[in-house]
Amino acid sequence: FGGASSAAAIYIRGIGQKDFVPTVDPGVGIYLDGVYVARSVGAIFDLVEIEQVEILRGPQGTLFGRNTIGGAMSITSKKPDEELMGNVQMTLGSDSRVDIKSMVNVPFSENFMGRFSLAQLSRDGYVERSFDGLDLGNDDTMTGRAAFRWIASDAVDVDMAIGFTEDDENGPAIELLGI
């Protein structure tokens, strides 16, 4: 990853896209639970529950379709299960960084269960803009996800999920140098 803000810059075998351009499709396909993420903006996810990440290098058009000339990145999130459990994780750091991530897994019945996650990530800016004192590079992100699994029969499982991310930031700190 190397993009600014929430735009991913993913390269596989030298093929990728650094900056967001609305008219250009990225050369590396990103898939979240099998769903294609069509643009690089918003492709940096603040996922709390990741089960697996697969990196498939080289052209993947046969399996994944267009926009995978460089390869594909497949992210699989954890599914709800039969166990009642939960956890909370907190990270503290410099520049007033506070990250809080939480998850709870609830079996509602023998064949219906849910998994809920919520994360709040915040950090103050690391560069002060000289003319107005605004901190640049600050980040305040909230993300959440609710996933449900219905085991209809021995042969049929139905998985449903919905998620959101809200990102409030002043943008990256960029300094122009006079030459």
Please report, for each region that a protein language model flagged, where it lies by residue.
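Short beta-strands and strand-coil junctions in structured, solvent-facing domains, enriched
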Residues: 1, 18-20, 37-39, 59-63, ...
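Extracytoplasmic beta-strand/coil segments of soluble accessory domains associated
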Residues: 1-35
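Flexible glycine-/small-residue-rich
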Residues: 14-16, 32-34, 57, 77-79, ...
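Short acidic/polar hinge/loop motifs at secondary-structure boundaries
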Residues: 20-21, 27-28, 33-59
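Outer-membrane beta-barrel translocator/receptor signature
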Residues: 25-27, 39, 48-51, 62-144, ...
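Residue-level signature of outer-membrane beta-barrel architecture
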Residues: 32-34, 106, 148-150, 162
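Outer-membrane beta-barrel translocator domains and adjoining extracellular loop/strand segments
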Residues: 43, 126-134, 171-177
